[in-house]
Amino acid sequence: MEKLTQLNDKLKSTGLPVVYRAWPEGEAPGLPFLCYYCEDDNPLIADAAVFFASTNVRVELYTETKDFARETLVETALADYPWQKTEIYISTEKCYMILYEIEV
């Protein structure tokens, strides 16, 4: 959990609102904001014991328009983690979701 706490701190350093998984009903701030959550674990097992464990985490940046400056803020915060990036436009919400997949 310490790794997730560190990630949370790095995401908060962007100045954007940050939440784990989802905002409580009716409490979501206006755009932009960040959401992150654990997708799955990758334990490395040796001699019938977990030798090393990492977690795949999804970090989602939601913006009203394509926002290169905020993407750069997030990418700077994620500098210690290798990431892959995907962009999705959510037409029903009229917003962009920039997805960063990282391993912590």
Predicted feature residues:
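Oligomerization/assembly interface segments of phage tail-like spikes and tubes
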Residues: A53-E64, C95-V104
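Residues at secondary-structure transition points
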Residues: A46-D47, A69
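Short Gly/Pro-enriched loop/turn and capping motifs at secondary-structure junctions
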Residues: D41-N42, E64-K66
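Short intrinsically disordered coil segments
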Residues: A49-S54, E75-A77
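Short, solvent-exposed beta-strand/turn "edge" segments of beta-rich domains on protein surfaces
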Residues: D47-V50, S91
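Small/polar-rich, solvent-exposed N-terminal microdomains that initiate assembly or binding
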Residues: M1-P43, A49
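Acidic-leaning, charged glycine-interspersed low-complexity segments
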Residues: T72-V104
